[in-house]
Amino acid sequence: MVLALMVQAQDATKILDQSASTLKSAGNVKIGFTLEVEGGSSDGYIKLQGQKFVLNMGGTITWFDGKTMWTLVKANEEVNVTTPSEEAVAKMNPYSFLSFYKKGYTASMGTGTAKAHEVVLTGNEGAPFKKVVIRVNKSTHYPTSIRMTSAKDAETYIRCNSLLKNQKYKPSTFQFNKKSYPDVEVVDLR
């Protein structure tokens, strides 16, 4: 029984390793997705370049250049500037599982489908999420959905709708540009 669980954990980790490798080798990507939480859903996209990202969803845009995070809530006409913790970045970037599954989680195989593997990550004490369920396309190795359960049992479901590989981004793509939003108040919380 213990041996079967060890093999299952190795298979789950191999699937995530392959998915992470495939996504990284895709170069800079733009992923369109639907985010579902209690009370509603929202479509958005994320542009990724290494650890840098810009996330646009539901009236909020978040830029992260690897050090500084800017979060613009359009309705408030305000952008908050922070130096986020690793956990804060993980919560904002739904594809951060590409690195965090290696520490703080126990991986196992879930119930997959004919087209997708299902990997279940169970958070160890102190992990940002209690449970993360990731579906990975068997032929492309790209993630197709991610279901995250917080320590307080709040669920977030992300479905990948599109993925564009080898995008070209300028460094400024991942930084807030005040000229683009001249009427927005900048609140520096660093």
Residue ranges: model-predicted function:
Residues 105, 110-190:
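Gly/Pro-enriched, hydrophobic low-complexity segments
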Residues 2, 22-24, 46, 62:
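Generic structural signal for beta-strand residues in well-ordered domains
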Residues 2-9:
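Hydrophobic h-region of N-terminal signal peptides that target proteins for export
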Residues 27-35, 42-46, 51-55, 130:
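One face of beta-strands
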